[in-house]
Amino acid sequence: YPPRFTQVTTEEEALNELKNRNFELIICMPNMDNRDIFAAATEIKIHYPNIPIVVLTPFSKEVSKRIANEDLSAIDYVFSWLGNAELLLAIIKLIEDKMNAPDDTASVGVQIILLVEDSVRFYSSALPHLYKFVLEQSQMFAKEALNDHQRTLRMRGRPKIKLARTYEEAVRIFNQYRDNMLGIISDMSFMHDGVKDPLSLIHISEPTRP
């Protein structure tokens, strides 16, 4: 079934909804009361640590500086809103893949595609295209199924996409899913040991080779 959205305009409304209903994902955006979205996301995470939180914000130099200096440990992902509605689907699928990948790789051998990129603007643009391609290929494959049950299984068996934003995160994901890794899509340079390393791709290729 398609996901259902509930929209609120203040942090107080969000906490009230979370208190009375179950939610699987929280998306924080700039709102009318000028509340800092990073602070609001952190406050919500304190009360609901098991619900993924995504910050979706228009991008600017100010936001870039904020992300570079902010403690984002309470936020699962930050995305740049570029006006593409398909980004919302990509966010939902990315969260689903993060939750389902351990069981699906162990039980039915689902494969993993690893995207390594630390630019919020780039992965916000790339993920919708990547998911669109994977889902279209999976739908074509599912058409060959004999019945609805087989079609569902084939759609569930599509490759899962994992996003790594640092060298350390990429190596951890690769080591976890080494036997199911279909491929790695990577930028040449990204964060390594807390600094931008222009040779990160070369470094990451070493532990990922057989």
Regions found by a protein language model. Name each.
Residues Y1, N16, R121-K132:
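Amphipathic alpha1 helix at the N-terminus of the CheY-like receiver
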Residues Y1-L25, F141-G183, F190-M191:
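Acidic, metal-coordinating helix/loop segments flanking the phosphotransfer/catalytic sites
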Residues N22-E24, I46-V55, N180-L182, R209:
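His-Asp phosphorelay/catalytic-motif detector in bacterial-type signaling
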Residues I202-P210:
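Residue-level detector of conserved catalytic or cofactor/ligand-binding positions
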